[in-house]
Amino acid sequence: MKVIDVHAHIVFEETLNFLDKEGPEIGGDENNPWFRVGDYKLEGVRYRNTPFMDLGLRLEAMNNLGVDYQVLSPNPITYFHFIDKHLAIDYCKMHNDTMAKAILGHEDSLGGFATLPMQDPHEASKELERCTQDLGLKGAYICLLYTSDAADDVR
């Protein structure tokens, strides 16, 4: 029986500081690492040199744990559903391109989920189509609360 993990968050080095003041940003030192997105700062969690950011370490950990396949997904605090839509569109495209490159050559072990610019449903739809049809990603992750509008807003 194949063991498949569909809840495997990842952060890519390429995404760090892409949005300037919004982040994402990693800082601190060995004893007090932190990860910041906007005004939110997650302290005490090491990202660099862990399976969270290093695919080699992730594949090694999967092997050691008997996990045959992981579908990588964006870190939920990097969905950026509340920033300017143009920035979100640029970030999502860059993140999704990076996701596709990361799994390239590891398709037997890794898949990927996209992140979408939910500020603009039309652009989110276009990006989902691009990610699944052109980049080979499996689908997308979104936050349940992605705008100040109701989920059934007709936009």
Regions inferred by a protein language model and the residue ranges of each:
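Histidine-centered catalytic micro-motifs
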Residues: 3-13
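Active-site gating loops and adjacent loop-to-helix segments of metal-dependent hydrolytic enzymes
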Residues: 12-52
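Single conserved hydrophobic/aromatic residue that forms the stacking wall/gate
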Residues: 146-155
